């Protein structure tokens, strides 16, 4: 299979999508929000391996256009594109990007609302989410904060990102199952619907291994993050649907629908773990790949993606989330394909 051609098809479908630029425009690249941030991160990772200058020019044009128009209000989700901007800065060394990175990182450090114990409250474009920790936060915000600290030589930012990973592990990782709850609330001290939601888990499967790889090998936080990630991966392999290779949107409830974006992100993490010598599950990882590839239409549109999902107070909430093509569905599938190009293709 030509994974590069497939990746191009998925990416081109995303670039062709037109939207209205609202914060809830989840398919097109017209918006500066978390779905587009996921897609930009994937595109930068492809550039790192391909050195495709046309792709780099498209990424630069996207960021330059949004900066010229003015960046949106700051929250956890609008932070997601900043990770790609930081990688772009590290790649191009264009100093014009540094002030935007520094200003946003300082807002995270000093302006973002905090929960008890100093956690990053999952503030979004439409909800305060008082005293709430979500696993999404680690991918959307903490990856950026750590890389910004690396790029601009700000060790305090790096240490804060490490602390946030440890705090989220403390409250969201289930030691009994190895899986992650979607969220935790200090008001009432509960896990909401106690859902082991697939995409929430997949942010960890994809994001934690990238984060751990960036840390020094002798860093104890790297060891903790890696071991927690390995425990999650072992649990995920037990939940995989044997017929399709995909995962259900509620990981431990086979009556819930199979979900593509989570499966793509999980496959990315498993493939990367195999490449790094941390896992030996290539057959199951490739079964997931085949399942995801089977959801890609002739025009590159990725099907079977659950729409943006806020916190649910019961499991039926997650079962009822509609299926809809999204930028993060395209982006996470594209991210998975980067590992196929690097590791097995």
Predicted regions and their residues:
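Inter-helical turn/loop segments and adjacent helix faces that build the functional surface
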Residues: 50, 148-159, 211-223, 273-280
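Alpha-helical scaffold segments in carbohydrate-active enzymes
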Residues: 9, 13, 42-45, 65, ...
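CBM-like carbohydrate-recognition segments
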Residues: 2-37, 49, 54, 65, ...
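Short, contiguous, pocket-lining structural segments
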Residues: 31, 133-137, 153, 157-160, ...
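His/Met- and acidic-residue-enriched segments that coordinate or traffic transition-metal cofactors
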Residues: 11-13, 20-30, 70, 171, ...
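Oxyanion-binding "anion nests"
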Residues: 205-251
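Extended ligand-binding groove/face enriched in aromatic
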Residues: 56-60, 68-185, 192
